[in-house]
Amino acid sequence: MYQPPRPFELPSDLAAGITSLYRENADAKVIIDSLVKLAYDSGKEQSELVHKKAKVDGPPATLSESIVSKLKIFLGINQVSVVLPIRKKLNVFIGADPRGKTWVWVSSKEDGSVDDMYPATDTADFRCVACLPVPDRSGTPLFNIVFVPGGAAQEVTTPPQPLVFSVPEEPAKKAFDGSLFLQGKDKNQFMYKDLILLGCQGISLPISVPDTEIFGEKFHVLAHKGAREGYLFFMQNEVIFGFKKPLLCMNTEDIESISFSTITRLTFNINIVLKSAPDVAMEFSLIDQSHYGEIAGFMERIAVKNESFDDKLKAKTFMKNQQPDNILAVAQNEAENEVPVAYDDEDEEDDENYTGESSASDGDADESDEEEAEEMEEQEREYDEELGDDEVEHDEDLG
Protein backbone atom coordinates (compact mmCIF):
# COMPACT_ATOMS: atom_id res chain seq x y z
CA MET A 1 0.00 0.00 0.00
CA TYR A 2 1.24 3.50 -0.87
CA GLN A 3 2.57 5.53 2.11
CA PRO A 4 2.86 9.34 1.78
CA PRO A 5 6.31 10.85 2.46
CA ARG A 6 4.97 12.82 5.49
CA PRO A 7 2.19 12.25 8.03
CA PHE A 8 -0.64 12.70 5.57
CA GLU A 9 -3.80 10.60 5.66
CA LEU A 10 -5.30 9.39 2.37
CA PRO A 11 -8.54 7.48 1.77
CA SER A 12 -7.80 3.75 1.41
CA ASP A 13 -9.23 3.54 -2.13
CA LEU A 14 -7.08 6.50 -3.27
CA ALA A 15 -3.97 5.00 -1.66
CA ALA A 16 -4.72 1.66 -3.40
CA GLY A 17 -5.11 3.41 -6.77
CA ILE A 18 -1.81 5.25 -6.35
CA THR A 19 -0.11 1.96 -5.39
CA SER A 20 -1.39 0.33 -8.58
CA LEU A 21 -0.23 3.32 -10.63
CA TYR A 22 3.36 3.39 -9.49
CA ARG A 23 3.67 -0.40 -9.81
CA GLU A 24 3.00 0.10 -13.49
CA ASN A 25 5.32 3.12 -13.72
CA ALA A 26 8.26 3.41 -11.32
CA ASP A 27 8.75 7.14 -12.12
CA ALA A 28 5.18 7.88 -11.00
CA LYS A 29 6.11 7.40 -7.32
CA VAL A 30 8.58 10.31 -7.38
CA ILE A 31 6.03 12.65 -8.98
CA ILE A 32 3.25 11.60 -6.59
CA ASP A 33 5.52 12.07 -3.56
CA SER A 34 6.37 15.58 -4.77
CA LEU A 35 2.68 16.44 -5.20
CA VAL A 36 1.85 15.17 -1.71
CA LYS A 37 4.71 17.18 -0.19
CA LEU A 38 3.59 20.34 -2.03
CA ALA A 39 0.00 19.91 -0.84
CA TYR A 40 1.16 19.34 2.74
CA ASP A 41 3.45 22.41 2.82
CA SER A 42 0.82 24.66 1.19
CA GLY A 43 -1.84 23.60 3.67
CA LYS A 44 0.47 24.24 6.63
CA GLU A 45 1.43 27.69 5.30
CA GLN A 46 -2.22 28.66 4.80
CA SER A 47 -3.06 27.49 8.33
CA GLU A 48 -0.31 29.69 9.79
CA LEU A 49 -1.59 32.73 7.85
CA VAL A 50 -5.12 32.22 9.16
CA HIS A 51 -3.78 31.86 12.71
CA LYS A 52 -1.79 35.10 12.44
CA LYS A 53 -4.81 36.97 11.04
CA ALA A 54 -6.95 35.74 13.93
CA LYS A 55 -4.43 37.21 16.35
CA VAL A 56 -4.50 40.59 14.60
CA ASP A 57 -8.30 40.72 14.49
CA GLY A 58 -8.72 39.48 18.06
CA PRO A 59 -7.46 40.89 21.37
CA PRO A 60 -5.84 44.33 21.80
CA ALA A 61 -2.23 44.80 20.79
CA THR A 62 0.41 43.36 23.08
CA LEU A 63 4.12 44.01 23.29
CA SER A 64 6.48 41.51 21.70
CA GLU A 65 9.44 40.34 23.78
CA SER A 66 11.86 42.12 21.43
CA ILE A 67 10.14 45.47 22.04
CA VAL A 68 9.66 45.09 25.80
CA SER A 69 13.37 45.52 26.46
CA LYS A 70 13.46 48.72 24.38
CA LEU A 71 10.67 50.60 26.16
CA LYS A 72 11.52 54.13 27.23
CA ILE A 73 9.79 55.11 30.49
CA PHE A 74 8.14 58.49 30.12
CA LEU A 75 6.73 58.49 33.65
CA GLY A 76 6.63 56.01 36.52
CA ILE A 77 5.22 55.97 40.05
CA ASN A 78 6.53 53.37 42.50
CA GLN A 79 4.53 51.60 45.20
CA VAL A 80 1.00 52.82 44.55
CA SER A 81 -2.18 51.06 45.69
CA VAL A 82 -3.79 49.55 42.59
CA VAL A 83 -7.57 49.12 42.95
CA LEU A 84 -8.42 47.59 39.54
CA PRO A 85 -7.90 45.17 37.86
CA ILE A 86 -6.26 43.73 41.00
CA ARG A 87 -6.08 45.12 44.53
CA LYS A 88 -2.38 45.19 45.25
CA LYS A 89 0.51 47.59 45.82
CA LEU A 90 2.38 47.80 42.50
CA ASN A 91 4.33 50.19 40.28
CA VAL A 92 2.69 52.09 37.41
CA PHE A 93 4.49 53.17 34.24
CA ILE A 94 3.79 55.04 31.01
CA GLY A 95 6.29 54.51 28.20
CA ALA A 96 6.91 54.37 24.47
CA ASP A 97 8.37 51.73 22.17
CA PRO A 98 10.83 52.41 19.31
CA ARG A 99 7.90 52.91 16.91
CA GLY A 100 6.54 55.77 19.02
CA LYS A 101 3.50 53.81 20.26
CA THR A 102 2.73 54.58 23.91
CA TRP A 103 1.83 52.01 26.56
CA VAL A 104 0.71 51.90 30.18
CA TRP A 105 1.47 49.00 32.51
CA VAL A 106 1.67 47.96 36.13
CA SER A 107 4.56 45.87 37.39
CA SER A 108 5.86 44.28 40.55
CA LYS A 109 9.30 45.54 39.49
CA GLU A 110 10.29 49.07 40.48
CA ASP A 111 12.68 49.50 37.54
CA GLY A 112 9.83 49.56 35.02
CA SER A 113 10.37 46.07 33.60
CA VAL A 114 7.17 44.64 32.13
CA ASP A 115 5.81 41.89 34.39
CA ASP A 116 4.48 38.79 32.65
CA MET A 117 1.50 38.77 35.03
CA TYR A 118 0.39 42.28 34.01
CA PRO A 119 0.69 42.86 30.25
CA ALA A 120 1.08 46.40 28.93
CA THR A 121 -1.92 48.11 27.31
CA ASP A 122 -1.81 50.40 24.29
CA THR A 123 -2.83 53.88 25.50
CA ALA A 124 -4.99 54.17 22.36
CA ASP A 125 -7.28 51.61 24.01
CA PHE A 126 -8.20 54.17 26.71
CA ARG A 127 -10.46 57.08 25.81
CA CYS A 128 -9.49 59.27 28.76
CA VAL A 129 -8.02 59.52 32.26
CA ALA A 130 -9.99 60.83 35.25
CA CYS A 131 -8.79 61.96 38.68
CA LEU A 132 -11.48 61.30 41.30
CA PRO A 133 -11.34 61.93 45.06
CA VAL A 134 -11.83 58.98 47.40
CA PRO A 135 -15.13 59.97 49.10
CA ASP A 136 -15.56 60.27 52.86
CA ARG A 137 -11.83 60.05 53.44
CA SER A 138 -10.45 61.17 56.79
CA GLY A 139 -6.83 62.27 57.09
CA THR A 140 -4.68 62.85 54.03
CA PRO A 141 -6.91 63.06 50.93
CA LEU A 142 -6.60 60.25 48.40
CA PHE A 143 -7.36 60.36 44.69
CA ASN A 144 -8.23 57.50 42.36
CA ILE A 145 -6.62 57.79 38.93
CA VAL A 146 -8.92 56.05 36.43
CA PHE A 147 -7.82 54.99 32.94
CA VAL A 148 -11.18 54.63 31.17
CA PRO A 149 -11.25 51.95 28.43
CA GLY A 150 -12.98 52.56 25.13
CA GLY A 151 -10.57 54.13 22.69
CA ALA A 152 -9.41 52.24 19.62
CA ALA A 153 -10.41 49.03 21.39
CA GLN A 154 -14.15 49.74 21.11
CA GLU A 155 -14.39 47.41 18.09
CA VAL A 156 -12.20 44.73 19.66
CA THR A 157 -13.96 41.74 21.19
CA THR A 158 -11.86 41.81 24.37
CA PRO A 159 -11.16 45.45 25.34
CA PRO A 160 -8.85 46.17 28.29
CA GLN A 161 -10.16 46.50 31.81
CA PRO A 162 -10.17 49.87 33.54
CA LEU A 163 -6.96 50.67 35.38
CA VAL A 164 -7.54 52.34 38.75
CA PHE A 165 -4.92 53.22 41.35
CA SER A 166 -4.83 55.52 44.39
CA VAL A 167 -2.35 58.27 45.21
CA PRO A 168 -2.23 60.60 48.24
CA GLU A 169 -2.46 64.37 47.98
CA GLU A 170 1.21 64.98 48.67
CA PRO A 171 4.51 65.56 46.80
CA ALA A 172 5.46 62.78 44.38
CA LYS A 173 8.42 61.50 46.38
CA LYS A 174 7.99 57.96 44.97
CA ALA A 175 8.04 59.00 41.33
CA PHE A 176 10.44 56.84 39.32
CA ASP A 177 13.78 58.66 39.09
CA GLY A 178 14.42 57.31 35.60
CA SER A 179 11.30 59.00 34.16
CA LEU A 180 12.11 61.00 31.03
CA PHE A 181 9.46 63.54 32.03
CA LEU A 182 11.35 64.32 35.25
CA GLN A 183 14.77 64.89 33.71
CA GLY A 184 16.09 68.19 35.03
CA LYS A 185 13.09 68.57 37.37
CA ASP A 186 12.60 68.15 41.11
CA LYS A 187 9.93 65.47 41.53
CA ASN A 188 8.98 66.87 44.94
CA GLN A 189 7.68 70.04 43.31
CA PHE A 190 4.80 68.00 41.83
CA MET A 191 1.83 66.53 43.64
CA TYR A 192 1.18 62.92 42.63
CA LYS A 193 -2.10 63.55 40.82
CA ASP A 194 -0.79 66.64 39.03
CA LEU A 195 2.32 64.78 37.86
CA ILE A 196 0.27 61.87 36.50
CA LEU A 197 -2.16 64.14 34.64
CA LEU A 198 0.73 66.15 33.17
CA GLY A 199 2.32 62.89 32.05
CA CYS A 200 -0.92 61.80 30.36
CA GLN A 201 -1.20 65.14 28.60
CA GLY A 202 2.37 64.65 27.42
CA ILE A 203 1.31 61.56 25.47
CA SER A 204 -1.93 63.21 24.26
CA LEU A 205 -4.23 61.08 26.42
CA PRO A 206 -7.42 63.12 27.07
CA ILE A 207 -8.18 64.19 30.65
CA SER A 208 -11.77 63.99 31.90
CA VAL A 209 -12.43 66.79 34.39
CA PRO A 210 -15.26 67.07 36.95
CA ASP A 211 -18.38 69.11 36.29
CA THR A 212 -17.74 71.60 39.11
CA GLU A 213 -19.87 74.26 37.41
CA ILE A 214 -23.01 72.37 38.45
CA PHE A 215 -21.85 70.15 41.32
CA GLY A 216 -19.24 72.40 42.90
CA GLU A 217 -16.24 70.75 44.54
CA LYS A 218 -18.23 67.64 45.53
CA PHE A 219 -19.19 66.23 42.14
CA HIS A 220 -20.12 62.74 43.33
CA VAL A 221 -23.28 61.33 44.90
CA LEU A 222 -23.86 58.17 46.93
CA ALA A 223 -25.98 55.62 45.04
CA HIS A 224 -26.75 51.91 44.79
CA LYS A 225 -26.78 49.63 41.77
CA GLY A 226 -28.70 46.64 42.95
CA ALA A 227 -27.30 45.80 46.38
CA ARG A 228 -23.92 47.33 45.54
CA GLU A 229 -23.17 50.68 47.15
CA GLY A 230 -20.93 53.11 45.30
CA TYR A 231 -20.54 56.65 44.04
CA LEU A 232 -21.70 58.28 40.83
CA PHE A 233 -19.13 60.79 39.57
CA PHE A 234 -20.36 63.40 37.12
CA MET A 235 -17.62 64.59 34.77
CA GLN A 236 -17.85 66.94 31.81
CA ASN A 237 -17.72 64.00 29.40
CA GLU A 238 -18.07 60.90 31.59
CA VAL A 239 -20.34 59.43 34.26
CA ILE A 240 -18.48 56.87 36.38
CA PHE A 241 -19.89 54.51 39.02
CA GLY A 242 -17.30 52.98 41.34
CA PHE A 243 -15.16 51.85 42.86
CA LYS A 244 -16.08 48.25 43.43
CA LYS A 245 -15.74 45.73 40.65
CA PRO A 246 -17.02 46.06 37.97
CA LEU A 247 -16.40 49.77 37.37
CA LEU A 248 -19.00 51.40 35.10
CA CYS A 249 -17.84 54.16 32.73
CA MET A 250 -20.43 55.95 30.58
CA ASN A 251 -19.40 58.52 28.00
CA THR A 252 -21.88 61.41 27.91
CA GLU A 253 -22.04 61.21 24.11
CA ASP A 254 -23.31 57.63 24.47
CA ILE A 255 -26.08 58.51 26.95
CA GLU A 256 -29.46 58.37 25.22
CA SER A 257 -31.63 59.34 28.19
CA ILE A 258 -31.80 59.78 31.96
CA SER A 259 -35.07 59.45 33.83
CA PHE A 260 -36.16 59.85 37.45
CA SER A 261 -38.16 57.15 39.23
CA THR A 262 -39.22 55.90 42.66
CA ILE A 263 -39.19 59.38 44.16
CA THR A 264 -39.73 59.47 47.92
CA ARG A 265 -39.52 62.19 50.53
CA LEU A 266 -35.83 61.41 51.10
CA THR A 267 -34.49 59.68 47.99
CA PHE A 268 -35.01 59.05 44.29
CA ASN A 269 -33.66 56.73 41.57
CA ILE A 270 -32.31 57.49 38.11
CA ASN A 271 -32.34 55.24 35.04
CA ILE A 272 -29.62 55.68 32.43
CA VAL A 273 -30.04 54.29 28.90
CA LEU A 274 -27.07 54.19 26.53
CA LYS A 275 -27.23 54.50 22.76
CA SER A 276 -24.98 51.45 22.53
CA ALA A 277 -27.46 49.40 24.61
CA PRO A 278 -30.91 50.98 24.04
CA ASP A 279 -32.84 48.04 25.49
CA VAL A 280 -31.13 48.17 28.90
CA ALA A 281 -31.90 50.77 31.58
CA MET A 282 -29.27 50.93 34.32
CA GLU A 283 -30.92 51.93 37.59
CA PHE A 284 -29.07 53.79 40.34
CA SER A 285 -31.14 53.99 43.50
CA LEU A 286 -31.41 55.67 46.91
CA ILE A 287 -29.88 58.97 45.81
CA ASP A 288 -30.39 61.75 48.35
CA GLN A 289 -33.06 64.33 47.42
CA SER A 290 -30.54 67.15 47.88
CA HIS A 291 -28.85 66.09 44.62
CA TYR A 292 -31.99 66.26 42.45
CA GLY A 293 -31.37 69.78 41.17
CA GLU A 294 -27.71 69.06 40.41
CA ILE A 295 -28.49 65.95 38.36
CA ALA A 296 -31.31 67.74 36.54
CA GLY A 297 -28.87 70.55 35.71
CA PHE A 298 -26.31 68.02 34.47
CA MET A 299 -28.94 66.43 32.21
CA GLU A 300 -29.76 69.83 30.75
CA ARG A 301 -26.09 70.63 30.12
CA ILE A 302 -25.35 67.40 28.23
CA ALA A 303 -28.71 67.70 26.43
CA VAL A 304 -30.05 64.19 27.00
CA LYS A 305 -33.68 63.15 26.90
CA ASN A 306 -35.63 63.04 30.15
CA GLU A 307 -38.00 60.08 29.80
CA SER A 308 -39.52 60.32 33.26
CA PHE A 309 -42.95 60.80 31.63
CA ASP A 310 -42.49 58.01 29.10
CA ASP A 311 -45.06 55.22 29.49
CA LYS A 312 -42.26 52.65 29.60
CA LEU A 313 -40.28 54.40 32.30
CA LYS A 314 -42.86 56.63 33.96
CA ALA A 315 -41.72 57.55 37.45
CA LYS A 316 -43.48 55.62 40.18
CA THR A 317 -43.62 57.52 43.43
CA PHE A 318 -44.94 57.28 46.91
CA MET A 319 -44.71 60.93 47.90
CA LYS A 320 -45.58 61.50 51.52
CA ASN A 321 -44.72 65.15 52.03
CA GLN A 322 -44.74 68.20 49.79
CA GLN A 323 -41.78 68.34 47.38
CA PRO A 324 -40.34 71.09 45.16
CA ASP A 325 -42.45 71.86 42.09
CA ASN A 326 -40.09 70.19 39.62
CA ILE A 327 -40.18 66.90 41.55
CA LEU A 328 -43.96 67.04 41.87
CA ALA A 329 -44.15 67.44 38.10
CA VAL A 330 -42.32 64.15 37.65
CA ALA A 331 -44.57 62.40 40.15
CA GLN A 332 -47.86 63.89 38.94
CA ASN A 333 -50.80 61.45 39.10
CA GLU A 334 -48.47 58.62 40.21
CA ALA A 335 -48.81 58.85 43.99
CA GLU A 336 -51.06 55.81 44.09
CA ASN A 337 -48.39 53.54 42.59
CA GLU A 338 -46.38 52.82 45.68
CA VAL A 339 -43.43 50.68 44.70
CA PRO A 340 -40.72 49.70 47.20
CA VAL A 341 -37.10 49.92 46.16
CA ALA A 342 -36.15 46.73 44.29
CA TYR A 343 -32.63 45.39 44.28
CA ASP A 344 -31.17 43.63 41.26
CA ASP A 345 -29.68 40.17 41.53
CA GLU A 346 -26.51 41.49 39.94
CA ASP A 347 -23.44 39.68 41.22
CA GLU A 348 -19.93 41.00 41.23
CA GLU A 349 -17.23 38.97 39.61
CA ASP A 350 -15.26 36.69 41.94
CA ASP A 351 -11.49 36.73 41.91
CA GLU A 352 -8.65 36.42 44.37
CA ASN A 353 -9.01 40.03 45.47
CA TYR A 354 -12.78 40.52 45.54
CA THR A 355 -15.57 38.75 47.33
CA GLY A 356 -18.61 38.64 45.04
CA GLU A 357 -22.06 39.62 46.25
CA SER A 358 -24.72 36.99 46.80
CA SER A 359 -28.31 37.54 45.77
CA ALA A 360 -29.38 34.87 48.24
CA SER A 361 -29.11 37.04 51.34
CA ASP A 362 -28.43 40.61 52.40
CA GLY A 363 -26.04 39.22 54.99
CA ASP A 364 -23.61 38.03 52.31
CA ALA A 365 -23.71 41.43 50.61
CA ASP A 366 -23.09 43.17 53.93
CA GLU A 367 -20.14 40.86 54.62
CA SER A 368 -18.67 41.64 51.18
CA ASP A 369 -19.07 45.37 51.80
CA GLU A 370 -17.40 45.02 55.20
CA GLU A 371 -14.43 43.18 53.68
CA GLU A 372 -14.17 45.82 50.97
CA ALA A 373 -14.26 48.56 53.60
CA GLU A 374 -11.60 46.80 55.66
CA GLU A 375 -9.32 46.60 52.62
CA MET A 376 -9.80 50.31 51.92
CA GLU A 377 -9.18 51.16 55.59
CA GLU A 378 -6.00 49.06 55.52
CA GLN A 379 -4.77 51.01 52.50
CA GLU A 380 -5.56 54.28 54.26
CA ARG A 381 -3.69 53.12 57.38
CA GLU A 382 -0.67 52.32 55.23
CA TYR A 383 -0.71 55.81 53.79
CA ASP A 384 -1.14 57.33 57.25
CA GLU A 385 1.73 55.22 58.63
CA GLU A 386 3.95 56.32 55.75
CA LEU A 387 3.03 59.93 56.42
CA GLY A 388 3.80 59.44 60.11
CA ASP A 389 7.22 57.94 59.30
CA ASP A 390 8.01 60.90 57.07
CA GLU A 391 7.14 63.32 59.87
CA VAL A 392 9.46 61.46 62.26
CA GLU A 393 12.30 61.56 59.74
CA HIS A 394 11.67 65.25 59.21
CA ASP A 395 11.83 65.94 62.95
CA GLU A 396 15.10 64.02 63.21
CA ASP A 397 16.55 66.09 60.38
CA LEU A 398 15.60 69.27 62.20
CA GLY A 399 17.17 67.98 65.38
Swiss-Prot record:
Location of the protein in the cell: Nucleus; Chromosome
GO molecular function, one term: DNA binding
Keyword set includes Membrane: no
Pfam families: Rttp106-like_middle
Region described as Disordered: 331-399
Keyword Lipoprotein on entry: no
Function per UniProt: Histones H3 and H4 chaperone involved in the nucleosome formation and heterochromatin silencing. Required for the deposition of H3K56ac-carrying H3-H4 complex onto newly-replicated DNA. Plays a role in the transcriptional regulation of the cell-cycle dependent histone genes by creating a repressive structure at the core histone gene promoter.
Family: Belongs to the RTT106 family.
Subunit structure: Interacts with histones H3 and H4.
The protein, known as: Histone chaperone RTT106
Originating organism: Yarrowia lipolytica (strain CLIB 122 / E 150)
Gene name of this polypeptide: RTT106
